């Protein structure tokens, strides 16, 4: 009966409706610093087609940044919103105040910054911050207030949009300060600054420092750890898809018990990005390794668990292919997923790689359960023409080295599936149980 049912309204959605329905911007914004939100709004503005929508985003930019010290840019936004060539006096006055405060910070921090630029002084510094501060006080007249000025100056530069200067000042502060709360705050500030200057190696160093700080400083505060890990997960999305070496590190981090628990508890929408990371990892060096297979199995398990908490075409692709074994639904969801990927700030650059890898996964799964495969049928499931599908299958057989023969006359592929021993089947089934036991043991140990 279900086979003869009319198409659902869901199947008739336009690309625009799909993009609007699965827009994650409202969920992401609460966990990002306002300066980190700005690139997302810029991207969203470029995606809009109507002037009305663009104007709304311009107003959002203004509301986002008006409390910062980016006075010139905020004034330009005001002019754009109000269609005015003049700048109100309040912006002129604030700009003067910002310049004066910058000059004051330069004066107040001049002595300590000069000391930190002196190779002879730096050469005498050790890993002991207390000893360093004592050395600077006794030998060079530096004070704790001077060190704290670096922190305030760094935050001020950040508010002005001078992220490179902010990163350097916060780093200098962190070298000397023994104030753990301010050091933690400075580390978050330096992470944001490295992201905004697209210094991905520096950003990844700060991700590790923030992670360590959460683990140690908030050890006796589970709720605080949960909140801070939620923030770190969201901030980590920037290097995740922009810095190749970060992919493995952050994917492993997200799959670790503490962070996968955070995702499932606080932000299940992050499954979109974890799914995209795992799927696109297929094209990378370790695509045939046990690590990739383990990540894929873990992902399938988590998508199944969170099905009632979060769904989008990207996670639904996994569900259709590996949970429901519905190849037609998988192809449909892949088409929708491509629309979502191209409209997502973090995933737009990974869209082609995702689609390519997803087609491979469909092909591999389809070939595993069929002895004789109709090339035309498989091509349709992959969204390819018959000629494209034929080339695709030839490449798939070559790349994966499966035992298969193509009958060009009949337009079919004959798969030679070796029988799997009962012993091997038992091993495969017990692997999953062993993993679950490990996770439960880790949870009980806490």
Swiss-Prot record:
Keywords for this protein: Cytoplasm, Initiation factor, Protein biosynthesis
Gene3D superfamilies per the UniProt record, alphabetical: 1.25.40.570
Residues annotated as domain PCI: 251-420
Molecular function terms from GO: translation initiation factor activity
A Gene Ontology cellular-component term: eukaryotic 43S preinitiation complex
Main location: cytoplasm
InterPro entries (alphabetical): eIF3e, eIF3e_N, PCI_dom, WH_DNA-bd_sf
Pfam families per record: eIF3_N, EIF3E_C, PCI
Annotated GO biological process: formation of cytoplasmic translation initiation complex
Key word Thylakoid present: no
SMART domains xrefs: eIF3_N (SM01186), PINT (SM00088)
Coiled coil, from the record: none
Compartments where located: Cytoplasm
Complex formation: Component of the eukaryotic translation initiation factor 3 (eIF-3) complex.
PANTHER family hit by this protein: EUKARYOTIC TRANSLATION INITIATION FACTOR 3 SUBUNIT E (PTHR10317)
The protein's role, per its UniProt record: Component of the eukaryotic translation initiation factor 3 (eIF-3) complex, which is involved in protein synthesis of a specialized repertoire of mRNAs and, together with other initiation factors, stimulates binding of mRNA and methionyl-tRNAi to the 40S ribosome. The eIF-3 complex specifically targets and initiates translation of a subset of mRNAs involved in cell proliferation.
Family: Belongs to the eIF-3 subunit E family.
Name of the protein in question: Eukaryotic translation initiation factor 3 subunit E
Organism: Coccidioides immitis (strain RS)
Source lineage: Eukaryota, Fungi, Dikarya, Ascomycota, Pezizomycotina
Gene: INT6
């Amino acid at each position: 009966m279900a086979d003869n049912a009319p198409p659902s309204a869901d199947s008739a959605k336009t690309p625009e409706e799909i993009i609007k329905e699965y827009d994650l911007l409202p969920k992401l914004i609460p966990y990002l610093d306002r300066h980190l939100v700005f690139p997302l709004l810029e991207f969203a503005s470029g995606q809009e087609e109507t002037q009305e929508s663009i104007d709304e985003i311009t107003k959002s930019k203004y509301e986002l940044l008006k409390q910062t010290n980016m006075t010139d840019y905020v004034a330009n936004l005001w002019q754009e919103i109000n269609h005015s060539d003049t700048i109100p006096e309040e912006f002129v006055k604030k700009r003067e105040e910002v310049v004066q405060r910058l000059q004051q910070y330069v004066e107040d921090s001049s002595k300590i910054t000069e000391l930190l630029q002196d190779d002879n002084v730096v050469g005498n510094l050790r890993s002991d911050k207390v000893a360093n501060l004592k050395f600077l006080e006794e030998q060079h007249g530096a004070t704790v207030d001077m060190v704290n000025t670096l922190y305030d100056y760094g935050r001020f530069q950040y508010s002005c949009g001078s992220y490179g200067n902010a990163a350097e000042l916060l780093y200098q502060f962190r070298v000397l300060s023994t104030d753990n709360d301010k050091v933690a705050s400075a580390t978050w500030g330096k992470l944001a600054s490295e992201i905004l200057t697209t210094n991905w190696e520096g950003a990844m160093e700060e991700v590790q420092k923030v992670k360590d700080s959460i683990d140690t400083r908030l050890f006796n505060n589970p709720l605080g750890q949960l909140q801070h890990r939620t923030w770190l997960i969201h901030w980590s999305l920037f290097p995740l898809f922009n810095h190749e070496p970060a992919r493995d590190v952050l994917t492993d981090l997200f799959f670790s018990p503490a962070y996968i628990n955070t995702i499932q508890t606080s932000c299940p929408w992050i499954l979109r990005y974890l799914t995209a990371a795992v799927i696109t990892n297929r094209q990378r060096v370790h695509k045939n390794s046990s690590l990739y297979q383990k990540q894929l199995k873990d992902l399938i398990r988590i998508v199944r668990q969170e099905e009632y908490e979060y769904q989008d075409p990207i996670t639904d692709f996994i569900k259709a292919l590996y949970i429901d074994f519905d190849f037609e639904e998988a192809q449909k969801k892949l088409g929708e997923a491509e629309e979502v990927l191209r409209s997502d700030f973090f995933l737009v650059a990974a869209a082609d790689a995702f689609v390519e890898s997803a087609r491979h996964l469909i092909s591999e799964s389809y070939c595993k359960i069929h002895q004789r495969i109709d090339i035309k049928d498989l091509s349709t499931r992959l969204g390819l023409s018959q000629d494209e599908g034929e080339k695709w299958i030839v490449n798939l057989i070559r790349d994966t080295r499966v035992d298969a023969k193509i009958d060009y006359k009949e337009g079919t592929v004959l798969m030679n599936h070796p029988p799997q021993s009962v012993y091997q089947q038992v091993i495969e089934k017990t692997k999953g149980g062993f993993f679950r036991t490990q996770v439960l043991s880790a949870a009980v140990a806490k």
